[in-house]
Each structure stands twice: as C-alpha cells, then as structure tokens.
Amino acid sequence: MIDLYTWATPNGRKVSIILEELGLDYNVHEINIAKGEQHTPEFLTVSPNNKIPSIVDSDGPGGPGGKPLSMFETGAILIYLAEKTESELYPKDFKKRMATLQWLMWQMGGVGPMFGQAHHFMFNPSEVVPYAQERYHKEAKRLYKVMNTQMQDNCYLAGDDYTVADIATFPWVDRFRRHQVDLTEFPNVKRWHEELWERPAVKKGMEVPFYNQ
C-alpha cells in the first residue's frame, strides 16, 4: 500500500495520475499548503524539503515484505513507481528511456518553475509587478512553443508512446488559462491536452485529493 501526501496542485496531481495509471492501491493524506501543514514536524519526516507531494511505500523497493520507503520530488517518484511496476511509462528500451528522461527533466527544470512563477505573478497576484508578468508570460509561451514543435511529428512528448514525461507535464498545461495562453495558438499541444483528458486515469488523478471526500 502507498500513502500519498498531497494537495490540489500540478505537482501533487502528477503522482495521483500515475498511481491511477498503474492501478496501485493508495491512501490519500491531504496536506493543506494554504494552512502551512507542509511545515509540520510530522510531514517533515516524509518530505525533508517540506514540499508536496511525497509517498511512503509500505511494500518497500523490493515488493511485499520490504521496508517502508519514503520519497519526495515528483520526478523521482514517477520513475520509482514506473520501475517498481516494470511499466513502459518509463520505457525499458534505452533510447526511449533517455528520450523520456530528457523530457521529464525539461518539465522539472523548465515548465514547473516557469509556469509556477507565471501563476504567482499573473493569477490573482497580491501585488502587480509588470516586469515579472511580462517575463514569465513570455517564457511560458516559449515553453508552449517548444512543446508544440516537439509534437509536430510525435504523438507525445518523448515520441509515439505515452510516458511519465506526459504525466509530469499535463497538470501544468491544464492551467493554461492562468498563463493567459490560448491553446489554439499551439494546435499540437491542444490536441495532446484534449487526448490526455480522455484517459480515465488522468480524469480520476486530477480530482485527487478531493474526489474521495
């Protein structure tokens, strides 16, 4: 059994999506970051960086009978869960795996931080900072363009197969309105976004942590 410590953010929903895709049993523990619950001593024991999401796998890395394993950082969690279950969401073929890793790191190092800043400065900001709004809006649109170009000849980010790179990126792109982005400008991204929304695991994962209330 996996315990998922999460909240309704793009990062949190990456992990609930992959758990649904893999059909793994999991318990949801809501960590209300608006109330600062990520800073409690209890949460610190499972996430040393005081960030959601994190998981505790009571079956451990070797399957049933192993020691409980705590993990934080979404990229690491996605790879761990895919490898634990021997899923092709993180391909076994070396070239495909490296392509997946490359685009996963692109999300972790670019999309997440830049879209996060776009959210902060453009979506109901407590203070309007025009320079920051222009900078992060411009960078967000650049990243959408990168995605659009990549998927001109590919069904998904890392090629023709759905992978952890798509799972990691989707919840951020789903907030495109907060970036003041019109997806019709990026038709390949729009097609990809609509297609992923049709996946049952994505629909269910995007409702966590509230769907089970």
For each feature predicted by the language model, list its residue ranges:
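GST-like domain detector, emphasizing the conserved glutathione-binding G-site
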Residues: 1-134
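GST-like fold's C-terminal all-alpha helical module
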Residues: 81, 107-200
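Terminal-tail/helix-coil boundary detector
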Residues: 202-213
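Phosphate-coordinating loops and pocket residues in cytosolic domains that bind phosphorylated ligands
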Residues: 45, 91, 169, 198, ...
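A local structural micro-motif
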Residues: 27, 90, 159, 184, ...
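Conserved beta-strand edge residues that scaffold enzyme active sites
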Residues: 33-34, 165, 210-211
